[in-house]
Amino acid sequence: MKGKAGGKAADAAEKVAASNRRARFDYDVEDTWEAGLVLTGSEVKSLREGNVNLSDAYAMPRGEELWLLNCRIGEYQQAAHFGHAPLRDRKLLMNRAEIDRVRGKVEQRGYTLVPLRIYFKQGWAKVELGLARGRSHEDRRGAIAERESKREMDRALARGRRR
């Protein structure tokens, strides 16, 4: 049994299983939501090992539910007979009002739901979804140039402080 002081810090910690770094480069993320994941036992064990790929994954509403598609969770080696399909569609758990709000925004032209990271929060697998609009090639170049100029300014300021 956990004590009150020790349990809160451990519960508040989030263990990130995977992050989609490419999503922030390819998309302009405007809003984020947290959703639970419906997983099998072998999928949870694979996630805890970090055996997941979010690079081509996206979420979309189907009927009254939200689904995560193209998220590859690798097979768990010790689950020989009771494994899972690595690319199966996975149901996302959100409140009805949140699902309706997300559906309204996704149905607008040009928006998509992109998983930004999968993590464990108090032992439960969660996914952070971002409402995103795709960037054009020119926008990506502009973002790179802006990031480089910010780095140069920070370096110049750091050099100025040292003197």
From Swiss-Prot:
PROSITE patterns: SSRP. CDD domains: SmpB (cd09294). Residues 138-157 have a biased composition (Basic and acidic residues). InterPro entries: SmpB, SsrA-bd_prot, SsrA-bd_prot_CS. Gene3D superfamilies: 2.40.280.10. Keywords: Cytoplasm, RNA-binding. SUPFAM superfamilies: Small protein B (SmpB). It is found in: Cytoplasm. One of its GO terms (biological process) is trans-translation. Residues 138-163 are annotated as: Disordered. GO terms for molecular function: RNA binding. The keyword Cytoplasm applies. One of its GO terms (cellular component) is cytosol. PANTHER family: SSRA-BINDING PROTEIN, TMRNA-BINDING COMPONENT OF TRANS-TRANSLATION TAGGING COMPLEX. Belongs to the SmpB family. Required for rescue of stalled ribosomes mediated by trans-translation. Binds to transfer-messenger RNA (tmRNA), required for stable association of tmRNA with ribosomes. tmRNA and SmpB together mimic tRNA shape, replacing the anticodon stem-loop with SmpB. tmRNA is encoded by the ssrA gene; the 2 termini fold to resemble tRNA(Ala) and it encodes a 'tag peptide', a short internal open reading frame. During trans-translation Ala-aminoacylated tmRNA acts like a tRNA, entering the A-site of stalled ribosomes, displacing the stalled mRNA. This is SsrA-binding protein.
